[in-house]
Amino acid sequence: MDLDRRAFLRIAGVSAVGAVAAACTTGGSPVPVGSTSPTTAAPSAPTTSRPPTGPPNWDDLRTRLSGGLLRPGDDAYAAAKRAFNPLFDGRNPVAVVQAATVQDVQACVQGIAGRVSIAARSGGHSYAGYSVPDGGMVIDLSAMNKVTVQGGKAVIGAGAKLKDVYAALGAAGRALPAGSCPTVGISGLTLGGGIGVLARKYGLTCDHLSSAQVVTADGKLVTASATSEPDLFWALRGGGGGNFGVVTEFTFDTDPAPNLTVFSLHFPAGSAADVLNAWQQWLPAMPPELWANLVVSGGSPVQCRVGGCYVGGASGLNTLLNNLTTNAGAKPTQRTVRSLDYLGAMKYFEGSSARQSFLGSSRIITAPVDAAKIVALADGRAGTDLLIDGLGGKVGEPAKTATAFWHRDALASVQVYAQATAKNQTKVSQSVAEVVTGLAAAGAGGGYVNYIDPALPDWKTAYYGDNATRLQDVAKKYDPFNVFRFGQSVQI
C-alpha cells in the first residue's frame, strides 16, 4: 500500500511514536550508477512470434538461474510464496523464482512465457493478491534491491522496499516522495503512480522517474525513457504494476532532502462531518508545502483525525492548522507538532512491517463532496477506515495525458481499508462494496490502481480514464500475447 493504515493512525494522533515531482530535474545527464544490468539492445519492434505452449521444463530453467527456484513440496516454498496479506496464503503458484540478476528474469520470461501466467513481485502488497497467482509463476525480485545515490540520481533495484530507499536517500541528503509503508516495494508504488506524504510539494513518485530497465514479454531487455521506448516509458508512469513487462531497475531524479514539521490533530467524537467539510475547503487553499490526510474511522461513534507534514517550521505550520480548526468549529482533543529531518520524518510515518489481513478499495475526490454522506458510510462499520489523502499542488501540474496517471485534477484519494479474516471475508467484502458505491453516489468516482479492487465494476475507467485506450495499445505492442496477465491487466 502507498500509505500504510497504521501510519495514518499514527500521524493522525492515535500514537506519537516515532514518499517525485512533475518536471523536477536536478541537472546533468541521467547516468545509471552501480547497475549490474546487462547491456540493453537498441530500440526495436517487439516480437510478433507467439510464445510456445505446453508444460514448462522446470529442470531446464533451474540450470539457467543463479537464484533459487521453489516448487510446491519444497521446504522453503510456503514461506517464499507468501505475500503481505495473509488472506492470500491459500493461493499456490506453480513456482517461485528468487531472481538474483536481470539474466534470471530474462530466463524466466524466455522459458515460461505462454506456458503459465507470470507475475513479478517486489513488496507483495497487491490489494487483490495478484502477485501470488494461483497456478502461475512468481518472479520474486526482492534480492535485486540495491540502492545507489550519486549526485541528483538514485538507481534503485526493482526489489527494493521503501525502508531501503529512504535509508539510502537520507544518508545522501536526498529525497524522493513516496509512500509510508516500509515494506512496500518501489516497483508497484512507482508503476501505479506513487501517492505519498510529499506529493503536494514534489509530485508523484512516477514523476521523478527518468528511465527504467524492462524485460519485455519476448525476454529482451530494453531501456524505457523519454527518448527510448517512449510509449513504454509513458505507460510505466501510472499504468499499474504487472503490465507490459518486468521492470528490473529504476533511475530517479531526486531533490535535496528538506527538513519537515509533522503534525497530528485528534478531534472529538461527533465532529467528523464538520472537520471533513472544512478540510476539503482548507487544503486546496494551502501552499503545496503542506500535505495533509484525514482519517474517518468507522464505528459508533465515528472518529476523525487529521495528520500530515509541512516543508517548513512549526510556527508557519501552526498558523495553517489554526485556520483549519477555526473553520471546522472543533477544538482538537490532542495536537502534536514536531520538527524532524527528512529521514526522521519518513520513519515517523512508517506503519507496521507486520503482515495484515484486510480488504481495500478506493475512490477519487475531484471537488468537495457532501461530508455528512461520507461520514455516514463509516457509521457502525467498526474496523473500516476511510483514509483520505490530500492531492493537488505539484501532482496537478502535468496534463492528465502526460503520463498514464489520470487523476491529476484530484483533490484527494479515498482509500477504503477494512480489517478482515478468512472467516468474515465475504461479509467484509460486501461492506466494502457498499462503501465504494456510497462514495460514488456522494460524488467520489474513479479509483487508484495501487489500491486495486477486483470487485470494482468500472475499474478500467476508474483507474485510467481516457488513458485506458492508449495503455491497451502499449500492452498490445509490448505484450501481444498477454504473457503478463491477471484479473485487471490492461489488455483485458
What residue ranges belong to the model's regions?
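Soluble FAD-dependent oxygen oxidases
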Residues: D2-I492
